[in-house]
């Protein structure tokens, strides 16, 4: 799990909207691939998956105050699509953050 502080409180709906608008287009641009990810609000977290290629989720993001608790599926840590998604997510979290400030609280 990785915990990031974005120094700003956001709702799951705000996070979901940003990811739905920008994640797939950014992925297509970076990987030159037509893979489309499913981004869903699952009540207590936002989940990113791609059921045609991967069993289960790729990322789960839970919001706790100003922190984002990010769980990455242990089955796909070395997968190139998962690594690309992580890079894009980090950029989008900067966009979401207060003044672009993202602080790593925990990575493990």
List each language-model region with its residue ranges.
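Polar/charged, Gly/Pro-rich intrinsically disordered segments
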Residues: 6, 44-63
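Short, low-complexity, polar/charged sequence segments that are solvent-exposed and flexible
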Residues: 22-26, 65-68, 88-92
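Intrinsically disordered, low-complexity regulatory segments enriched in Ser/Thr/Pro
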Residues: 55-83
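Negatively charged, low-complexity tracts enriched in Asp/Glu with abundant Ser/Thr
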Residues: 1-47
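A conserved amphipathic terminal alpha-helix motif
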Residues: 78-108
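Generic N-terminal initiation segments characterized by hydrophobic and/or small/turn-forming residues
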Residues: 13-16, 56, 89, 93
């Amino acid at each position: 799990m990785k915990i990031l502080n974005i120094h700003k409180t956001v709702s799951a709906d705000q996070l979901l909207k940003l990811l739905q608008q920008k994640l797939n287009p950014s992925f297509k641009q970076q990987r030159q691939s037509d893979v489309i990810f499913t981004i869903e609000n699952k009540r207590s977290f936002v989940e990113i998956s791609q059921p045609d290629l991967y069993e289960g989720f790729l990322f789960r993001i839970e919001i706790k105050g100003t922190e984002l608790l990010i769980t990455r599926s242990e089955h796909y840590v070395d997968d190139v699509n998962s690594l690309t998604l992580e890079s894009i997510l980090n950029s989008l979290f900067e966009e979401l953050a207060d003044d672009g400030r993202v602080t790593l609280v925990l990575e493990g």
